[in-house]
Structures are given as C-alpha cells and as structure tokens.
Regions:
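Conserved Rossmann-like nucleotide-cofactor binding loop
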Residues: 51, 55, 76
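Gly/Ala-rich phosphate-binding loop of Rossmann-like dinucleotide-binding domains
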Residues: 56, 60
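Beta1/beta-strand and adjacent pyrophosphate-binding region of the FAD-binding site
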Residues: 34-51, 69
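Sec-dependent signal peptide cleavage junction
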Residues: 15-27
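Positively charged n-region of N-terminal signal peptides that target proteins for export
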Residues: 1-9
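Conserved redox-cofactor binding core of oxidoreductases
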Residues: 124-205
Length: 205
C-alpha cells in the first residue's frame, strides 16, 4: 500500500511538472521573436539592494535625461536585499593597501581565482570610493562616520578570514546615517534609497 501510494505521488509530481513545463512553453516567447516591447528604457536595473540603488544613482548622474527603471521582486516593505540586513558599513581600504587587499580577495576565491585585471579594478575602486559615497550621502542629509558615532577612524583592520594572507591592512569602516545621528539601522541602504527617490528614478516592486 505504501509503495503504491509513493508511486502514485511520484506520478502526480511528474505530471504536474510536465504540465507546468508545457504551460511555460505556451506563454514564454523567445526574445528573438518579440517585435514590439511594452516599454523601453535606457537602463534596466534588476534588484533594489545597495548595488541596484548605487547603479541607479550613478546612471542618473551620468545622464540625468536617461530613462531608468529599477525592478525589485520583493514588496516595498521588504526592499533592501541583503544590504539592509548587513553590518551597515562600507569597507574603505587606504590607497596604500590596494595590493594587500588584492592578495586577500585572491585567496578568498581559491580554487577559482579572480583575474588580476578585475581584482585591480575592484580594489582601486574600494580605495577611492569614499568621496563619491560622501557626495551621495550629503545630497540627502546623510553622512559617513564611525559605526558607533563620531568621525571615521582610520587604522589597521582585520577582516573576516584572518588566517588568509592579506587579511590585515590600513583602512576604515564607514557607516552612513542621517546627519546628527550616531547610528541608523539600515542606514547604508536607506541613504542610497533616498538618493534614488530624490532623483525621481522609477522603482517598481
């Protein structure tokens, strides 16, 4: 009886998957067959976490006349992706620490190492990102500071995997919060979300 029931359930599952696949084939049109689109934009950004919000801000500031659309699968009350639940800081290594950070990230991604050209670009961006972050923050009355309050504190940092070569380097950890506050829960993402809103960028949940 149990074997028969298990077989019946398996057949039902296979049937459901088959019907679902057939239904999908009926309503999903290959992109090369689409002649007319309901809407066209200059920049389409999928995901409204910190990366999506930052991309939207940068796209707008490069071309204020560009049509930008951000799509987020979650409801607006749960927007922010992983970014809103993270430690709420940016890692900003000193420019003198770029090679050390490259070594650390290289070791973090073994046995599938990141190409050196990309690592160089990424780490140079880490080390020079702070002025842009402060520019975005200032535009919505936010500021970058130490996560416990006060100004940024530069010095020796040890990141997550301290057993990896390159895990210790000079830099700071920058938290974003409303001006005058000491800490804001979700402040890093909320700052960029406010910057997106200020620019009138279309976000759909």
């Amino acid at each position: 009886m149990k074997k028969a029931l298990a077989l019946l359930m398996s057949l039902a599952l296979v049937l459901a998957m088959t019907v679902g696949a057939m239904a999908a084939e009926d309503w999903v049109t290959p992109v090369q067959n689409i002649e007319n689109w309901d809407e066209e934009v200059d920049f389409l950004i999928v995901g409204y976490g910190l990366a999506g919000a930052a991309a939207a801000v940068e796209a707008h500031d490069i071309d204020p006349n560009a049509k930008i659309l951000v799509l987020e699968k979650m409801p607006e009350t749960l927007a922010g992706g992983n970014s809103i639940a993270s430690g709420q800081t940016f890692l900003v290594p000193a420019e003198s620490a770029v090679e050390t950070v490259k070594t650390y990230l290289y070791n973090c991604n073994l046995p599938n190492p990141i190409p050196d050209e990309y690592l160089t670009w990424l780490c140079n961006g880490f080390a020079t990102q702070l002025p842009w972050i402060e520019y975005v923050a200032d535009g919505v009355d936010y500021e970058a500071g130490y996560v416990g309050g006060g100004e940024l504190k530069w010095g020796s940092m040890v990141v997550e995997f301290s057993n990896f070569e390159g895990s210790t380097f000079d830099g700071c950890s920058a938290h974003l919060r409303a001006k005058g506050a000491t800490f804001e829960n979700g402040g890093v993402w909320r700052c960029f979300a406010k910057a997106v809103e200020k620019r009138g960028i279309d976000v759909r949940f």
